[in-house]
Swiss-Prot record:
Key words of the record: Cell inner membrane, Cell membrane, Membrane, Transmembrane, Transmembrane helix
Pfam families hit by this protein: Virul_fac_BrkB
Species of origin: Shewanella sp. (strain MR-7)
Protein name from the UniProt record: UPF0761 membrane protein Shewmr7_3708
GO terms for cellular component: plasma membrane
Polar residues bias locations: 307-319, 328-337
Family the entry assigns: Belongs to the UPF0761 family.
Cellular localisation: Cell inner membrane
Length: 337
């Protein structure tokens, strides 16, 4: 008896997962995340150099970050730009150096382009959440400016804190000697989960539950790590872009990776936004009343519907009886001799 109950619970669990995946697939088709990811990838490439320039300028404003700027750059390029990170780093640093020599108007233009990227991300995520209320211009600009100014500082502070913890003598013992390499190896994964979690909870202009955002963040971080390894393997083992484009191979490689990254980010957002919809639907309907395709079973006649049909038929019978009763005297009169 207990095994039957456990088997039924497992079946209900898998059926619920299957129904959620069907709902998620429908959402992905409706929202066209491939088109949104292409738009965000295009805006990202336009905003990449201005964003890096603004970020490095913010880090340079704090003396504590001057000594670890190279470490921050190496960490970002190695973990977020697989395979082509070294080449991209050389080009971006050169572009940033040229951009920093510009006038005040040019620097202001860089800030505007960087804000355009954050605005595009904001609009895409709020469209996924079906948000109807829009932020005011003042609130939106304040949020964008906070991301540009405080974002690099928080990233730098977290890396400084991590470097400090790793350098402590507390972790030099034999018991913890194997813990630190494992922690450092998992550090990019933890940063990815934290970044996605913050993105899914803060950017949408509505309340997002922590556990829903955490689920989307974990899935997105896992896919991001797998995507890095898979893309790096593809670029190194199948160098078709280098054979076709030669020295310009970095451009399409960077664009493809940015596009895949945004696909992963939007997929995590779709999972986070679909969870409350699915749970609300499940709370209002019985999971056993639908088939595996997510379609409701054929509705059967309910007792409540039968009285309506009976009353309708009764009214028709009464009308027919009245008509016959009205014509009956006439016919009887005509039949008299």
């Amino acid at each position: 008896m207990t095994k039957k109950i456990e088997l039924a619970q497992i079946q209900v669990l898998f059926l619920g997962i299957w129904r959620f995946l069907l709902h998620l697939r429908q959402r992905l088709v409706e929202d066209q995340i491939n088109i949104r990811a292409g738009h965000l990838a295009y805006v990202t490439l336009l905003s990449l150099v201005p964003m890096v320039a603004v970020t490095m300028s913010m880090l340079s404003a704090f003396p504590v970050f001057k000594g670890i700027r190279g470490q921050i750059e190496a960490f970002v390029y190695e973990n977020f730009l697989p395979a082509a990170g070294d080449t991209v780093q050389v080009y971006i640093n050169e572009f940033v150096g040229n951009a920093s020599k510009g006038t005040a108007v040019g620097i202001a233009a860089l800030v505007v382009v960087a804000i355009m990227l954050i605005s595009a991300i904001d609009k895409s995520l709020n469209n996924i959440w079906r948000t109807k209320e829009k932020r005011s211009v003042v609130v939106a600009f304040s949020m964008y400016w906070m991301v540009i100014t405080l974002g690099p500082v928080l990233v730098g502070a977290s890396l400084v804190a991590t470097s400090y913890v790793v350098s402590l003598k507390l972790f030099e013992g034999d018991a913890l000697s194997g813990v630190m390499p494992l922690f450092i190896e998992r550090l990019p994964m933890l940063f990815s989960v934290a970044a996605f979690l913050l993105l899914y909870m803060v950017v949408p202009n509505q309340k997002v539950k922590f556990w829903h955002a955490l689920l989307g963040a974990v899935v997105a971080a896992l896919l991001f790590e797998l995507g890095k390894k898979g893309f790096a393997l593809y670029v190194t083992k199948f160098p078709s872009y280098e054979a076709i484009y030669g020295a310009l191979a970095t451009i399409p490689i960077l664009f493809v990776w940015v596009y895949l990254s945004w696909m992963i980010v939007l997929l995590g957002a779709e999972i986070t936004a679909a969870m409350p919809e699915y749970l609300d639907y499940e709370s209002s309907s019985d999971i056993n009343e639908t088939n595996l395709d997510g379609q409701p079973l054929a509705a059967q006649d309910t007792p409540a519907a039968q009285p309506e049909t009976t009353s309708a038929q009764s009214s028709q019978v009464l009308e027919t009886t009245d008509e016959l009763a009205a014509t009956a005297p006439q016919s009887s009169t005509l039949d008299k001799p």
